[in-house]
């Protein structure tokens, strides 16, 4: 096999990633038999080992499920796919159909499964390919909107916002009494990206908006796709107006999450953009807090959401009916209500895109109940390009370097730029090693990588957390 050249794959070999295997005892079975009986699930975060992975294994005692921490980047799975190492089941949080398109032919079509049929069509459309196939399904949503300090509104006798106009009025009223009406952690790419999209959800969800999103995500589209000239120019105009209405400036670009939380706790900030988890967090600290949606220009109200992760299955499973059935059982369990309850934080509301999961809202989301009941939960466009370009362009809008027109042109041109391909060789191995665990010999890939690192550092002993590598070692 040729030498593998890819800078991002460095994470496979050098970043310490915890991998936990929840396997039944296999006795003296051959490695081939163990491999055939094992369903490998790559989880995007170690947090899923706390409650989620153990629950799935408990529900499936007759199936050997091997959990491995993979990577929250679809480029990682593209690399595995190109080199014959794609796992049985994949999960990824930072996701877009655009970035997932190169994997399409290697993933199972789930469009006719009960799991896909349970997802509300308005949400499933975000995962449907141009040919009608569906490779990825979402688990429950993390809702993002405006975390609001009701105590400050009551203290200064300022009405809670009910639309965009009253939101702006509240910001202006707080400014007069020396309190910041709104800010957010704009040092992060996702805050820049979600604010830009959140202000124009109605338009991005319109016929024209969906038309553009379909073209942008089309797996058959071999050329890079930019922004359209219908929906997006106005989106940047709204962003420009929002910056003016809220008084965002260069200083806000240095704000991180801790800075925002400290301002909020000290009574210096009335509203910030963030996760609904913040409501419970501040309520527990004695601060009367509520959660509000994005107010749209046309009067609609929407929540920005991101699935905690998306799930896909390897198409190779269809070549073995026994393994396919096992994998489908694992998928069904992963998407079950009880399993999804173990994804979210304690006290957080379970917001599912599935009709099979009951909606049971707590007091923390009472002010957005009608929004959720209307299925106004927008799933963000979250390609790698959108993260990086949003950070660059929105930051320059906030600093005053770009107006709406300049921002649109810059964003569009950056989307159309061809990516430079790295030629860095990260490994030159004369032999391949499997990352499967076998009862007779452990994990060969983990062993050889551990020994390689030990040699690099001239150490007799390597101490690592659990199983520290995610992929096969490939022959050069």
What are these regions (language model features)?
Residues 47-49, 66-67, 129, 305, ...:
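C-terminal capping/gating helix-and-loop segments adjacent to ligand/active sites or protein-protein/ligand interfaces
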Residues 58, 64, 156, 283-346:
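Extracytoplasmic/periplasmic substrate-recognition and gating elements
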Residues 58-122, 151-162, 262-263, 270-271, ...:
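Extracytoplasmic "Venus flytrap"/periplasmic binding protein-like
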Residues 87-88, 116-151, 180-181, 296-304, ...:
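A structural signal for short loop-to-beta-strand junctions that line the ligand-binding cleft
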Residues 93-144, 159, 168, 194-195, ...:
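Hinge/lid segment of periplasmic solute-binding proteins
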Residues 135, 168-224:
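Extracytoplasmic/periplasmic solute-binding protein
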Residues 215-253:
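Glycine-centered hinge/linker elements that transmit conformational signals in sensory
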Residues 423-476:
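Solvent-exposed loop/linker segments at secondary-structure transitions
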């Amino acid at each position: 096999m040729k030498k593998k050249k890819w800078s991002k794959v460095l994470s496979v070999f050098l970043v310490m990633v915890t991998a936990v295997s929840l396997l039944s005892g296999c006795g003296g079975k051959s490695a081939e038999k163990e491999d055939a009986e094992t369903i490998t699930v790559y989880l995007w975060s170690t947090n899923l080992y706390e409650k989620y992975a153990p629950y799935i294994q408990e529900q499936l005692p007759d199936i050997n499920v091997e959990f491995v921490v993979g990577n929250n980047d679809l480029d990682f799975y593209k690399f595995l796919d190109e080199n014959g190492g794609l796992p049985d089941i994949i999960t990824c949080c930072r996701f877009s159909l655009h970035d997932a398109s190169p994997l399409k032919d290697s993933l199972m079509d789930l469009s006719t499964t009960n799991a896909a049929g349970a997802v509300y069509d308005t949400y499933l459309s975000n995962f449907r390919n141009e040919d009608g196939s569906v490779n990825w399904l979402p688990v429950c949503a993390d809702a993002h909107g405006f975390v609001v300090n009701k105590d400050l509104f009551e203290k200064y006798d300022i009405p809670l916002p009910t639309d965009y106009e009253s939101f702006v009025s509240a910001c202006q009223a707080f400014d007069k009494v020396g309190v910041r009406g709104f800010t957010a952690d704009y040092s992060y790419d996702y805050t820049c990206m979600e604010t830009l999209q959140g202000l124009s959800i109605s338009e991005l969800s319109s016929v024209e908006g969906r038309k553009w999103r379909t073209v942008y995500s089309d797996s058959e589209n071999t050329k890079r796709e930019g922004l359209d000239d219908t929906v997006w120019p106005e989106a940047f105009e709204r962003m420009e107006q929002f910056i003016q209405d809220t008084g965002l400036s260069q200083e806000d670009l240095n704000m991180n999450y801790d800075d925002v939380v400290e301002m909020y706790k000290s009574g210096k900030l009335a509203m910030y953009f963030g996760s609904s988890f913040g409501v419970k967090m501040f309520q527990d600290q004695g601060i009367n807090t509520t959660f509000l949606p994005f107010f749209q220009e046309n009067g609609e109200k929407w929540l920005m959401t991101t699935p905690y992760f998306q799930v896909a299955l390897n198409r190779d499973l269809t070549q073995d009916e026994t393994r396919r059935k096992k994998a489908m059982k694992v998928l069904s369990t992963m998407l079950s209500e009880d399993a999804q309850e173990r994804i979210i934080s304690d006290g957080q509301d379970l917001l599912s895109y599935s009709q099979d999961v009951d909606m049971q809202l707590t007091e923390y989301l009472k002010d957005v109940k009608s929004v959720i009941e209307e299925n106004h939960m927008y799933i963000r466009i979250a390609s790698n390009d959108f993260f990086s370009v949003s950070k660059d362009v929105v930051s320059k809008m906030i600093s005053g370097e770009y107006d709406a027109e300049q921002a649109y042109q810059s964003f569009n041109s950056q989307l159309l730029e061809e990516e430079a391909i790295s030629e860095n060789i990260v490994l030159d191995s004369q032999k391949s090693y499997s990352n499967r665990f076998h009862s007779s010999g452990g994990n060969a890939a983990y062993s050889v990588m551990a020994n390689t690192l030990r040699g690099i550092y001239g150490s007799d002993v390597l101490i690592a957390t659990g199983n520290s590598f995610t992929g096969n070692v490939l022959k050069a």
